[in-house]
Amino acid sequence: MSNTLIVYYSHSGNTRKMAKIITEQLHADCLEIIPQKSYPQAYSAVVNQAKHEISQNYQPDIKDIQIDLNKYSTIFIGSPNWWSTIAPPILTFIMQNQNHLINKEVIPFCTHGGGGFGHIPQDIKKLCSQSKILTGLASYDSTASNTDIHKWLTKINIL
């Protein structure tokens, strides 16, 4: 049993790819956050919906999580960068599980189309104020290689 969990939401597959690499390198458990209602696939439609949801601090319903978060001491949280912050399904996950994140190492990672991390690390630090937030990694689309991720995990003393 691993004491590390990789939690992520992915719309286009980029964040999923990054999450899978982290999972494989750490031999960790992995949990995909899935919204009850899928986002549109058309780029302009998802951009407009995400912008509206984020401006309203909206927390969409997500599918039930069948995992005991208490057994993990380290939790990676991955999201696409949507309007410089986490995707709403990840906000829902964090808000529903704040008590289970207390005193844990929380490590953000994201994929983006040019906006870098935006303010994702600061947002996660604010939402997980009683957690130890470690340095995250932002990847353009899904360009983070196995080597890039290995170097990052080594740098933050996870490997």
For the regions a language model picked out, list residue spans one by one.
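Short, glycine-/small-residue-rich phosphate/pyrophosphate-handling segment
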Residues: 107-144
